[in-house]
A protein has these predicted regions:
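Conserved helicase motor core of P-loop NTPases
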Residues: 1-140, 146-148
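Short beta-strand-centered aromatic/proline hotspots
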Residues: 152-163
Length: 166
């Protein structure tokens, strides 16, 4: 089964306002996005060590618990509780979208690559994933536009089991 992304939500709401401020090079406006986010969708965190980020990824914040655990719980519970496979897929995607760690740089211990690796290793250590190249629940990011399918650079999807192949 193929699931197609039809609408990008990457730059809407508070995260969209933050992205515009950052891309425009307006740090004061970016900081104001955090102060003005009454829905609690954004949180500013300056961790002292990488372990703090790993705890955040596993459990979320005190005022917004969860981290990646709710999404992974849905992945592992499977679709049995849902009338349709597509309903389960939407629930998993929604749960995944409810938590993000954004990095200012790509490389290094504090960059996207370093934190993604550290988070995956911790999730595996805690039994939340079975890490391999294509483990169930693995996030994937599109790295170039494909106008034919409507999938664009930066869009995110998840690897899930094919219901036709249990």
């Amino acid at each position: 089964q193929t699931v197609m992304l039809r609408h990008s939500h990457r730059f809407s709401g508070p995260i969209g306002e933050l992205a515009l401020a950052v891309n425009a090079g307006k740090p004061d406006l970016a900081r104001a996005c955090f102060a003005g986010d009454s829905g609690g969708q954004l949180a500013w965190s300056v961790p002292a060590q990488q372990e703090d980020v790993l705890r955040l990824a596993l459990r979320g914040r005190a005022d917004a618990p969860g981290g990646y655990q709710p999404y992974l719980a849905l992945v592992h519970a499977g679709e049995a509780a849902y009338a349709q496979h597509d309903d389960w897929v939407r629930a998993v995607l929604h749960a995944f979208e409810s938590f993000r760690i954004l990095c200012a740089v790509r490389e290094g211990e504090w960059g996207v690559a370093g934190l993604n690796t550290a988070i995956e290793l911790r999730l595996e250590k805690d039994g939340l994933i079975r890490r391999s190249e294509w483990y169930v629940g693995r996030p994937v990011m599109v790295t170039r536009n494909d106008y034919g399918t409507g999938v664009f650079n930066g869009d995110i999807g998840l690897t899930l089991r094919d219901p036709a192949r249990p």
